[in-house]
Regions:
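Conserved glycine(s) in the ABC-transporter nucleotide-binding domain "signature"
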Residues: 1-89
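Broad gene-expression machinery/nucleic-acid interaction feature
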Residues: 33-35, 98, 277, 339
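Phosphate/dinucleotide-binding and metal-coordinating scaffold of catalytic cores
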Residues: 83-327, 331-333, 345-462
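Conserved protein-kinase catalytic-loop segment immediately C-terminal to the catalytic Asp
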Residues: 338, 343-345
Length: 462
């Protein structure tokens, strides 16, 4: 590869990962506001820029302009033209994605050379309804290639590829938590043939078990088990359980939030300890419903206001469920809510969106990364994020006021602590949770403007 081709590849990669759009200034009720705006699928999208992020956002927008100018110049050179022609040839020779996209044994889309030519819009996965990008959808279902045990798993399965699409297609892109799968052209397979009925590589995916290399390659749900932590699926008495590795603080945080939600009557995945690991029961009950991460609708934009408006457009009731999730995340200090760890449940037969999925993946919450230094939550970073959201989204604040929010008491906290076999600072947990609840309640009930000047404190005491 020539130096020009290498630089073009570098620029294209950086541009693909860079901020997109332009900065727009608005004056609302006499107050200056700035928004990042861009066009997506023919529609104008907008994201509020917080005061402390404005200069950085401006710099990123200017950086993108500079990259685009350099790329345009390089593509016009002889080496640039040659690189473009080689890339077109590679696309023509890429893996032939031709066949049918299935839901159980029902055809929901026809795919020819990577393009959807016919589809049942009712049942199509949400990501495909929005983008039509079958390659992106397939790639999103593959195991994270950066996990150490992912590489070991592929070696044990004799899978000679680093390509996410090929990895997913090795098991027809099937997963435990939905009934979608890909049927290659000419295949006579039915859903019963491809659905997962066993997993002989669970221990390899979870802990790098060396004995797994002696096993004969077989179908495993680990090739479509996404996420960055080492984990695995185990089939126990006919039910799938997700096992995950971690430390005692991560286990405590996951268990505490699970038990708290259960006692408050909030939808949650069930978690429990099993020896050295924590496990959670498949909340789709063997894909009785289809789970789809919110990334299907918003890509990587986890901004509260953006997600709220997207969900409100589906159903005000689902938007309320999202507000309850944000309430729990804020009170319990979940630092890692992103677009791959919350989502929607859909009816398998009709495609109807039923509800937000239950709360799960709280292993980077509460004290998972140490005891936050601001125990009384007076300058709490996550509550600050909620504050900014409520300031800019009056609809959300009004919905919160209409809702009957749960009430956490000291007795409920003590019950949760008593049921978790992990030693922690009980008084700290009580104070931290109750103060968080009080701060969030104050935000929701407050009538005036919420200050943007407060600097969030994300300090931890380790």
């Amino acid at each position: 590869m020539s130096d020009t081709a290498k630089r073009i590849a570098e620029l294209e990669k950086e541009l693909a990962e860079s901020i997109n759009g332009y900065i727009s200034r608005k004056v609302i009720k006499g107050k200056e506001r700035f928004y990042l705006q861009w066009t997506e699928n023919g529609k104008l999208k907008s994201r509020y820029i917080k005061a402390g992020e404005l200069e950085q956002t401006r710099a990123l927008v200017e950086r993108r302009k500079s990259l685009q100018a350099e790329l345009k110049k390089l593509k016009a050179t002889p080496d640039g033209v040659k690189s473009y022609n080689l890339k077109r040839k590679a696309v023509r020779n890429m893996q032939n994605i031709t066949g049918t996209l299935m839901s159980e044994d029902h055809v929901i889309a026809t795919v020819k050379n990577g393009v959807i030519t016919d589809a049942d819009e009712r049942l199509l996965p949400l990501y495909l309804k929005r983008t039509g990008n079958i390659e992106g959808w397939l790639a999103s279902r593959a195991i994270d290639p950066h996990r150490t045990n992912s590489r070991l798993l592929k070696r044990a399965l004799r899978l000679r590829t680093t390509d996410d699409i090929a990895t997913a297609l090795a098991v027809n892109a099937a997963t435990v938590t939905d009934r979608y799968w890909f049927k290659p052209e000419g295949s006579s397979a039915v859903y019963e043939d491809i659905r997962f009925k066993e997993n002989y590589f669970a221990e390899l995916a979870l802990r790098g078990d060396p004995d797994s290399f002696s096993r004969k390659p077989s179908r495993t749900p680990e090739l479509t088990n996404t996420g960055s932590f080492e984990k695995c699926w185990k089939l126990i008495d006919g039910e799938w359980w997700m096992y995950k590795s971690g430390n005692k603080e991560e286990y405590f945080s996951e268990l505490f939030i699970c038990k708290l939600c259960e006692k408050l009557g909030l939808p949650t995945a069930h978690y429990e300890l099993d020896g050295r690991y924590i496990r959670s029961k498949d909340f789709t009950n063997g894909a009785a419903v289809n789970f789809e991460p919110i990334r299907a609708l918003v890509d990587d934009d986890e901004d509260y206001e953006n997600c709220f408006h997207v969900l409100y457009g589906i159903s005000p009731e689902i938007a309320k469920q999202y507000l309850l999730l944000l309430w729990t995340d804020s009170v319990c200090y979940n630092m890692d809510r992103h677009t791959e760890n919350f989502g929607l449940l859909r009816d398998v037969k009709t495609g109807k969106i039923l509800s937000l999925a239950p709360n799960y993946d709280n292993n980077i919450a509460l004290i998972a990364k140490g005891y936050p230094s601001d125990v009384r939550r007076t300058h709490d970073g996550l509550i600050g994020f909620l504050k900014a959201f409520l300031q800019d989204c009056e609809e959300a604040r009004e919905l919160y006021r209409e809702m009957r929010l749960p009430e956490i008491t000291e007795d409920i906290i003590d019950e949760c602590l008593d049921e978790i076999p992990v030693e922690v600072d009980r008084e700290y947990i009580r104070t931290f949770i109750l103060c968080g609840q009080d701060r969030v309640r104050e935000l929701i009930e407050m009538d005036g403007d919420l200050s943007e000047d407060e600097e969030p404190n994300m300090g931890l005491t380790l």
